[in-house]
Amino acid sequence: MAGLWRAYQRLLGAHPWKVQIVTAGSLVGVGDVISQQLLERKGLKGHSIERTVKMMGIGFCFVGPVVGGWYKILDRIIPGSGKPVALKKMLLDQVAFAPCFLGCFLSIASALNGLSGEQIWGKLKRDYKDALITNYYIWPAVQVANFYFIPLYHRLAVVQFVAIIWNSYLSWKANKS
């Protein structure tokens, strides 16, 4: 396991942006598998590989680049370290970024599932508030720890490992009828 971590560290050092994006996409896919198998209990025969691929695509093309880029911007807006800085970053993340990100995520997943603009709007009206409230139960504490203890280039990976559970929830929320 330590050897895998060292290899990941080397790759991250050589290609930080690419590795962060691949990590995010892969872990969004893992979250979807968990959603389908544990939350929805679809079994192997009922598992939608197409859905998992779509969710991974969202991870590669949206989650990885957007969240990774956001962390870089956040470090420029609020430079430094320490508890007060971590708290400020968490507050800005949760007040400004999380609501927009969540709405975009649900909209993109719905569009990839073939919903019309009107249907996407209905889904957002039905599911967005609940998803945002659930976000606030989980992410403030995670983000304070992330911003206080974790270096910039590891933040996306740390968040995505914690987010395996969150991604399972989001996949379920985004794909339920």
Curated annotation (Swiss-Prot):
Underlying gene: mpv17
This protein's name: Mitochondrial inner membrane protein Mpv17
Site feature (Determines ion selectivity) residues: D93
Function statement: Involved in mitochondrial homeostasis, and control of oxidative phosphorylation and mitochondrial DNA (mtDNA) maintenance. Non-selective channel that modulates the membrane potential under normal conditions and oxidative stress.
InterPro entries (alphabetical): Mpv17_PMP22
Top-rank taxon, per record: Eukaryota
Stated family: Belongs to the peroxisomal membrane protein PXMP2/4 family.
GO BP term (any one): regulation of mitochondrial DNA metabolic process
